[in-house]
Amino acid sequence: QFDKGCIWAMQSWSLREDIVKAVPRENLLILDLAGKRVRRDQGFWGYPTVIGNLHNFGGRINMHGDLHLLAANQYQDIKKVYPNVCGDGLFMEAVEQNPVYYDLAFEMFHRTDKVNIHTWLQQYAQRRYGARTVNTDQAMRLLLEGPYRRNTNGTERSSIVAARPALNVKKSGPNAGLGIPYDPLILFKAERLLLADAELLKHSKPYRFDVVDVMRQIMTNIGQPIHKKAAEAFEAKDKTAFALHSGRFLQMLEDMDELLRTRPEYSFDRWLTEARSWGETKAEKDLMEQDATTLLTVWGAQEGNDPGIFDYAWREWSGLINGFYKVRWQKFYSMLQKHLDEGTGYSEEGLKLSHGRESFRANDFYISLGDWELDYTRQVNKARTPITQGDEIEIAKRLFRKYEKLSAAYYQTKVSNADIIKTEKTYENLGE
């Protein structure tokens, strides 16, 4: 039995014209999750369509999002060309990241006009912080020039923090790579301006969130050249330089964990505590924690099979950094140090890849690491108490001074990844 009046909702990832036209128009609603295919596929041949933005995959933490695109009101523009477009939506896989993006996106649902993004950002900062200052205005302009610039929609860039360790780290999750699509020094300028108003804005919780978020992004960005220096030192057999740069990288992970522990939004400990609360018995609580851990680490694996899209839902979260990501990097650097001490080499050339990065058990190191990762998902009672600890502004100021000094050593030339980003395969549809 079936309802003859039902409406099928179909995602547009792999639609084919023959499949679509086999269904009466009144019984089909197409969801163009990223708003890209409607133009390519002739407006889906007149079928009712909802366009939108798929801004986040897996709950990953990365500052990004094309605010210019949102402000241009893409729904109204597309509807003029394809009248069958009947709605606009957001199809993110998780929230609690990039609040400025969602604030504007939800506002645009209620508007038929375009928005002056510069004016809107000034008003947004005033609403968010409870005051408007020259510093916050300038900081917002810099963020628009940086992570929220044009062509930053869709798949977020990878995290060196959450990436499985390698000499040549290609990506963290199975999607986009590590390229930073803006000058990372922009964030230092923005954070300096935000921190300058700390005394005035310290009572604003959103201000405290933003100060932490920008500092987090500064640290994950600079982590890339720090690790690159460590890898270069290993290949040059320079033990002193290797110890310096690998030590700085591991310390950066500890610093980031301390910073993010100030906010519940960035807490793996909160995630695990809430997961356990769903269980009634100890066995149920343990299972909930194991499932919640698996989701953010190996993603999932059937008995006897290795994970295929491990680290799909990576998060730069306190607790997860300290207990999982840092341990992976410690194991990797210890392995490299052993090779240096013994005068032997280590190469990743020719290793089997999975979605553009080394597969789960690509060599002896990854076999051992994979065993540890799977064992980690089975551990219980990992949550630390208290869940939050420390003052956001105090810690952000201290870390800003530290990493601003380090930036001179690691950003000696202007960083540009534009060409790499344009040509890389991001696997937005993991069935590809």
Language-model features, listed with the residues they occupy:
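Short, Φ-rich (hydrophobic/aromatic) sequence segments
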Residues: 101-109, 215, 219, 325, ...
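Catalytic-core regions of glycoside hydrolase
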Residues: 1-157, 161-184, 235-243, 247-250, ...
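Long, low-complexity, intrinsically disordered segments
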Residues: 422-432
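Membrane-interface helix-loop junctions at the exits of transmembrane helices
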Residues: 98-99, 197-204, 260-263
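C-terminal substrate/ligand-recognition segments
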Residues: 169, 174-203, 207-235
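C-terminal amphipathic alpha-helical interaction region
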Residues: 208-212, 216, 224-229, 237-421
